[in-house]
Amino acid sequence: MRAPGFWHEPAGVASTLLAPLGALYAAGTARRLRTGPRVRVDVPVICIGNINAGGTGKTPTAIALAQRLLAKGVKVHAVTRGYGGEVEGPLCVEERTHTAKQVGDEALLLSAFLPTWVSTDRQAGARAAVADGAECLILDDGFQNPALAYDLSIVVVDAWRGFGNGRVIPAGPLREPVEIGLKRADIVLSIGPDAAQQRFATTWGRHIAVPHLTGTLQPLPTGLPLDGLPVLAFAGIGHPEKFFQTLRSLGADLHATHALADHQPLTDTLMIRLLRDASMRGAQVVTTEKDAVRLSPEFRAQVMTVPVRLEVDDWGPLDSAVDKVLGR
């Protein structure tokens, strides 16, 4: 499902008419958070979440944070519900044996970097990770889930889109009002280029009373140069156009783009159609790292993947906060 366009436009007729439903949604979120058990486990828990529905860069943030913790010698595990997967868990994901259909694409991608537990019951997932030797947990997308207590919360936001029209689902893109959500945040990380960061700071900066980090998603080099390469690109992520723009910035000659729904299954029928279309155009099929893990092996070899990694302008405030919860 694609987000309605009016979510990211100044409040108009549609968002105003839907505002009462948004108020009910916000009340439900507040009640769930207020009455949740907030169980504490025996190791520090770092929550990476957002206030917006949809993609904001949580997975690249989790990967980058995990790499920093692992470099410090911390045995860090990820706990996620495995959105889009079939497994209830708790299950430690094996990158080479599990599929995105079983555990979800985000969990499968995370498992390439750190031990990752899928569990619809986050408490059970956390306990399983601790029993397996985890010294610290990264809780993926748990900001509005009251099952676990966490020691540090990082709210990730797309700098271009910000908090949209500032209204709650279905009137806008938010899971809860900005001023309420940010009161629970310890750090805000906005991701995007300089122009987007300036726009975000101008529009939303006054709402942020905690350390505000900025960063960008930078593509990693691939074996095949993209400059001048004829490309048919597809992406089933929160904001596909960001990926297409990344390809353009690398010099790719985009002959066609296909914006799929977030987490959309990549069926044989769909992939055969895309590959046939690319062949007729003399183009290379290119996709994101998160989409690539949903491909079956027979198609994965025919599709070029462009991975991205988070680069933060100043890790200092986050490093200090992490060291504090780790007792260092």
Swiss-Prot record:
Pathway: Glycolipid biosynthesis; lipid IV(A) biosynthesis; lipid IV(A) from (3R)-3-hydroxytetradecanoyl-[acyl-carrier-protein] and UDP-N-acetyl-alpha-D-glucosamine: step 6/6. It catalyses: a lipid A disaccharide + ATP = a lipid IVA + ADP + H(+). It comes from the Bacteria. One of its GO terms (molecular function) is ATP binding. The keyword Nucleotidyltransferase does not apply. ATP binds at N52, A53, G54, G55, T56, G57, K58, T59. One of its GO terms (cellular component) is plasma membrane. GO terms for biological process: lipid A biosynthetic process; lipopolysaccharide core region biosynthetic process. Its EC number is 2.7.1.130. Keywords: ATP-binding, Kinase, Lipid A biosynthesis, Lipid biosynthesis, Lipid metabolism, Nucleotide-binding, Transferase. It holds the Pfam family LpxK. Coiled coil: none annotated. InterPro entries: LpxK, P-loop_NTPase. NCBIfam families: lpxK. Transfers the gamma-phosphate of ATP to the 4'-position of a tetraacyldisaccharide 1-phosphate intermediate (termed DS-1-P) to form tetraacyldisaccharide 1,4'-bis-phosphate (lipid IVA). Belongs to the LpxK family. This is Tetraacyldisaccharide 4'-kinase. It comes from Jannaschia sp. (strain CCS1). The lineage of its organism: Bacteria, Pseudomonadati, Pseudomonadota, Alphaproteobacteria, Rhodobacterales.
